[in-house]
Amino acid sequence: MPSNTSRSVPTGFYYKQNARMQNRPRFSDRKHSSKSKHRFPVDPSLQPDEADEGTRLLGNSDSDLLEPPSEHSSNGEDDKDINNPPSMPSSVCSSPKSPHRHYESDEDIENISLPESHPEDIQRKEFETENGKNTRDQPSPLAEVSDFAISSPHVYPKSANSHDSHYEQFANNDVTESAVDDHPATRKLSRDELYLPISPNNAQEPKFSVLDEWTKKMVANFEEYSVEDVDKRRERNRKLSEPLLVNGRYRVRDRWAQFRKSEIEKPYRFTFFTDELPSTIHSHEMWELVHDGQSFEDLFHSGGTWWLDVSCPKEEEIRVLAKAFGIHPLTVEDITLEEDREKVELFRTYYFVTFRSFNQLPSNSEYLKPLNFYLVVFRDGIITFHMNPTPHPANVRRRIRQLNGYLTVNADWIAYALLDDTTDAFAPFIEQIEDEVDTIDSMILSIHYDHVMEVKPQERMLQRVGECRKLIMSLLRLLANKADVVRGLSKRCNESWQVAPRGEIALYLGDVQDHIVTMVQNLNHYEKILSRSHSNYLAQISINMTLVSNETNEVLSRLTILGTILIPLNLVTGLWGMNVKVPGQDVPGLGWFFSILGSLMIFAISSFILCKWYKVI
């Protein structure tokens, strides 16, 4: 046992060694002895820094070192010790048969092993070649954490260079320390291998044979067409066919929705583009992308950066492409289930971007409905998926043709161009909103309470304000998370990971981020203006209604005073109109008549003058 005075040993490391040498439990309430033969072996001859380096991944504290399961476990389950939690948390998927894992068959599930670049391989040297002796037969902590190894995201079906093959090589007692140090299983892992999840298919090159086999299967099922029909269809599908520009930009025309068209006349679903080919290849089915006698490997290796655009993909097509290009099951799940959340994720051989656009047809019932756009960007190519027709791929291809000879196109640039074109699609709508907001604001401020009749031509003002605010909220919902996605993608450009975007793309992504931030700020400003205009309009309407009510009350008050003046006159005339004896009835002449009429007029005039004097009317 090393001395405490000769060198400085970490507290957890020394206590671990001391507890092991004294054969006593570390805690009084531990259910099993600490001298178990499953204890993680540490060479006492190691220097403190070396021992600490050997346990860095697992942690250098007492509770962070690997501990075996209890020997008193029942029914094959480990006892839970709250004082000694496991050093590695269990994975979310605790079973290889979890629904989140996608394997072709049960045979693939059985052939699960640790990859060569698993983080635990760093520790393999210490517990397999201790003091130059083989310890293969000794119990290893790796055997106790097999559940973690299976549930870890760093697993894939066995291959020729699997974990077990390395164990077979280490089983030879004649192996030297230099051979162990040079072996790939004991090499120091890079940052990519430690933190990036890998796909089930760990092959560096795509398996184009999977696409070729699937093509043969689909061609065999296409027997109802004659050979001439198939050739004509392929000849038509492989021509360059870009839609026309509308007002300077391409807009999807819903031509095929007016009446039912044949299978051949339906819109293209697959588009293969590379700057080395003279034309773009369009097809309805994936197997139609290649000629007779041509393989997908010849197509994708035709030179330059390739781009495969898939519109309205079927689940079978997604899984075939995932199997051929080694796309992770999590990415396949996001594409199949049409994940709405915009994000960027890095995997071992590619990075995955989810972006959202919208339906740009005002005549469509799904106008401004969000459309999901998925980008799987490899180092030498890109695959895009979208569930609805969208103009962005055609716009980017046209842009690449225009810039041909001025710039070298790569997969990262195509991804940037798609994000940029999607962002630019919001600009015309924001300009339209700006004009509408200025018109509404000026019309509301021009309303004056002295001109009540001017309110009548603006009966739809509230409706216009409501529609404009609805459009603003829809665009804000689409632009809300885009800045975070572009910002996250820009940060990846400065990372050292192999699949991260190249550094020069960060400049272009910064421009896209500036556009998004500016659009969001403008929309928020327009929303505030409309909110203020809405309140001003309602206040102006309330004032106008109050003025109209006051005028009505004034007229009613005048009529009331007039009625008050005429009531005495009606009383006098009513009295003299009775069929009874009245004064002056027998007097000849009209003296009594004019005197009564004059007195009534004098009373009315004097009453009116008196009301005017006191400003009653």
Swiss-Prot record:
It is a multi-pass membrane protein. It is found in: Membrane. Gene3D superfamilies: CorA soluble domain-like (3.30.460.20), Magnesium transport protein CorA, transmembrane region (1.20.58.340). One of its GO terms (biological process) is magnesium ion transmembrane transport. Its main location: membrane. Interacts with sad1. Belongs to the CorA metal ion transporter (MIT) (TC 1.A.35) family. This is Putative metal ion transporter C17A12.14.
